[in-house]
Amino acid sequence: MSSAATIKQRFGLVGRSDIYDRALNTAARVAATDLTVLITGESGVGKEVFSQIIHSLSSRKHNKFIAVNCGAIPQGTINSELFGHEKGSFTGATADRKGYFESVDGGTIFLDEIGEMPLDTQSYLLRVLESGEFIRVGSSQSQTTD
């Protein structure tokens, strides 16, 4: 397990406080698990940096990492972006497309600004987080992701 000092050195982090060191030590501890992690905090406090630290210290470190700002994705396309879509499922869907969850399978996805998502998308997201299952837009087939 990495100590706060080791993590700071490895990732070029600066700062000194007991709370900061505890947060870094917690990141190292959760990186050793295969659990979904919720990182909370105000905008600009480094949630994405912590997610990258957790990914880099985890067994998933050799797989993809993707950070998604959910607040920047238009409401009409967010389900397609996250879960993918089938050819012909809407105007302009000329081919099947993998969503972020499918393309990062086995890796790490960091979802920022999830509170900005439409409520129906949040319920789809909850299903993915609970069971790893999702359905592409325009499909009736359930798929799984890790």
Question: What is each of the regions a protein language model found here?
Answer:
Residues 1-25, 32:
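Conserved ASCE P-loop NTPase core motifs with emphasis on AAA+ ATPases
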Residues 12, 25-91, 102-118:
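Conserved post-Walker A coupling segment in P-loop NTPases
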Residues 20-24, 75, 94, 98, ...:
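Amphipathic alpha-helical transducer elements in NTP-driven molecular machines
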Residues 22, 53, 81, 124-127, ...:
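Alpha-helical transmission elements in cytosolic ATPase-linked domains
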Residues 31, 118, 129-130, 137:
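Protein kinase-like catalytic domain
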Residues 64-66, 96-106, 110, 118-124, ...:
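AAA+/SF3 P-loop NTPase mechanochemical coupling elements
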Residues 88-95, 130-137:
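Short gly/ser/thr-rich secondary-structure transition/capping motifs
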